[in-house]
Amino acid sequence: MRIFFRTALFLSFIIFCSSELHSTHIRAGEIIAKRISSTSLTYEFTIIGYTDTGSEVEFGGGKFDFGDGNIIDVLDESALSAQKILLENQVALNLFKVIHTFQAPGRYVVSYFEQNRNAQIVNMENSVDTPFFIETEILIDPFFGLNNTPVLLIPPIDNGIVGIRY
């Protein structure tokens, strides 16, 4: 019996140590594209992520895809600035700015992908294992002038309650 408990304890320890830890934290996000100059194809991209402040995992460990074949890690040195602003209701706004120049006019789907979405989202099955993904589309056309994406003026954070009209 003693050998059984030791074996069970040993196996439990091995399983616990080999499992990958995922702390969930991402609630919402957006990508803002702002063309810097009318004479170049250079854009300033702002990636905004809204996170739970109770998590020790920082936002920004994902991949940012410019839609032209260039993909960067948001936490690497290509980010011009990184900022974290504490909001109310245990929510933080995480902001990263990146500059990118496109090679030619065209339509580009710009996206951001990261693991660790927050758990217990009622209208989404298995939200904790569903990666966080946001995208926006920009059209660079010399006849349209400067093309910027819309900017959300109110953070997309709701505190809904099941069964109660919001």
Listing of model-derived features with the role each one plays in the protein:
Residues 1-27:
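Bacterial Sec-dependent N-terminal signal peptides
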Residues 21-166:
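Long, compositionally biased, intrinsically disordered segments
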